[in-house]
From Swiss-Prot:
Tissue expression summary: Expressed in placenta, testis and pituitary.
Composition bias, Pro residues: 141-152
Pfam family, one: Cys_knot
GO molecular function, one term: hormone activity
S-S bonds: 27-75, 41-90, 44-128, 52-106, 56-108, 111-118
Miscellaneous comment: Encoded by a cluster of genes that have evolved by duplication from LHB. HCG-beta is encoded by six non-allelic genes (CGB) clustered on chromosome 19q13.3 and named CGB1, CGB2, CGB3, CGB5, CGB7 and CGB8. Two specific hCGb proteins that differ by three amino acids in positions 2,4 and 117 have been described: type 1 (CGB7) and type 2 (CGB3, CGB5, CGB8). The CGB gene first arose in the common ancestor of the anthropoid primates.
GO biological process: G protein-coupled receptor signaling pathway
Entry's localization field: Secreted
Signal peptide: 1-18
Region (Disordered): 129-163
GO terms under cellular component: cytoplasm; extracellular space
Gene: CGB2
Identification of the protein by name: Choriogonadotropin subunit beta variant 2
Amino acid sequence: MSKGLLLLLLLSMGGTWASKEPLRPRCRPINATLAVEKEGCPVCITVNTTICAGYCPTMTRVLQGVLPALPQVVCNYRDVRFESIRLPGCPRGVNPVVSYAVALSCQCALCRRSTTDCGGPKDHPLTCDDPRFQASSSSKAPPPSLPSPSRLPGPSDTPILPQ
């Protein structure tokens, strides 16, 4: 009887410790550097902003073939504001203003492709799409740590559900 009680105490304390200090950072705004370019403008620059990133708890069924899949949540924008910058050197007739999102708060929710990169493989890390800027090792090539904002899926408000 005492072994069962000891096991119960150890398991309950372990759960308490895990809930106080999550193993992975939760969904929250983090600082990020994004590449900004526009078709027709001969420049690619980087901007500092905040994006939503982090862990969202999810579950999966053990018997996936028998029961329907559970919806999976991802780290999404809750509150966002947009800021604009003017790209230098754009030719006459090309609007040099580009807007980008700044995450104010985040939430774990179903992935909405209209506002969120729902994952998947990326061709390139955070780089400019124009090949003139990709081969350069100048400051125009941003660090290879984040996906390019131009690689986001097309707008749609349909949530991504597991197959």
